[in-house]
Amino acid sequence: VTTRSIATKLAMALALVAAGGVSAALAAQVDHVLLGIDDLDHGIKAFEQATGVKPVYGGKHPGGTHNALVSLGDGTYLEIIALQKGVTDAGEYAGLKQLHTLTPIGWAVSSKDSAELRKRLSAAGLAVTEPVPGSRITPAGATLSWQTFGLKDNFAEAPFFIVWSAQTPHPATTSPSGCKLQQWHVAGSHLKNLEQLRAALDLRIDVADAKATSMRLSLKCPQGAITF
């Protein structure tokens, strides 16, 4: 293979992309992983004791939850989420009061190109819902905003999808650092759907077949490796 032939093939490929013949690479990734717990202060202390990194308080969500955050590097962060003091019901998050240790409860996938993200999912046979706006107020009084959507035929192991407002700094760049994501493992009875999702978005996750849904987060932190 000559240098000239390689250059010719590259030029042809770039021309196809420019003409819309093939889709450019989609920058989709695991945006954040959620660890649920019954009390946020307890969760912050437990995480710091286990890892050597203290999560920073993020703020309150309109729906009755609040959170603390840790950067996991490379555009991914960890969200510890709990009910706000005095809140007894927060819809889908009401079950947080039953969690007495930090427990993986969900995950999100992000992309800066919402239209392409939805297109890829649709092409893989995964229909999506309409976007819903979301927000959080920081301790400094700033409002962070985003849009989320999910799969129409949702299942327990599935992520939700998030597109951050252009004016909102990503939490991975503003939260305490020191921990790195080593592995995000998702298992459940919808293995085929998980594999479709992983392939469509080229996600770096591990998936497995199981009767019951389970999620496992492995980190490398200042005090060593830890798994939740």
Segments from the language model and where they lie:
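N-terminal secretory signal peptides that target proteins for export/translocation
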Residues: 1-7
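Bacterial N-terminal signal peptides
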Residues: 9-21
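N-terminal short leaders/motifs
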Residues: 20-28, 61-63
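N-terminal beta-strand motif that seeds the catalytic metal site of vicinal oxygen chelate
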Residues: 25-40, 102-112, 160-192
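Amphipathic alpha-helical segments
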Residues: 40-54, 120-124, 190-201
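Glycine/small-residue-rich interface belts in oligomeric ring/scaffold proteins
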Residues: 40-96
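Vicinal oxygen chelate
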Residues: 69-73, 78-82, 115-185, 201-228
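A basic- and aromatic-enriched beta-loop-alpha substructure that forms the phosphate/nucleotide-
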Residues: 83-117, 121
